[in-house]
């Protein structure tokens, strides 16, 4: 696993990935892009294929979200990951949002704040939870903002990406 993580950063840098993401956002009419930690099954242990937040930000934490605008970006981490996040995003433009700390907006509040009037927030509908999407939409309503589902992660992360899991499902 560590070898794969190193490959991420040899291939190109976080600033280059953010530039590519911003270009794709612009091409798709997206003002803000949200990358949550998640997969289509809301798995507790994330398959490597769905580590898009790590790929674009360099941060390896759990229970996180990453928001990118044309001019800024921020990653949310809970208390277990404050020190790790500081180290992993050091030297980048990415702002660390310490979840639960006084004065720190939730990811939903932040999306509502940075989205322009009548703006469009993009996210991959496969990885975002229903609760997250509803919370974000509630914040966007004040600005008449909309959510557009598109998968810029698949479009941009084409080299060295682990395959989607092909393991059998278990009926519980």
What are the roles of these predicted feature ranges?
Residues 2-10:
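Short, Lys/Arg-enriched N-terminal segments with co-localized hydrophobic residues
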Residues 120-126:
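Acidic beta-strand-to-loop metal/phosphate-binding motif
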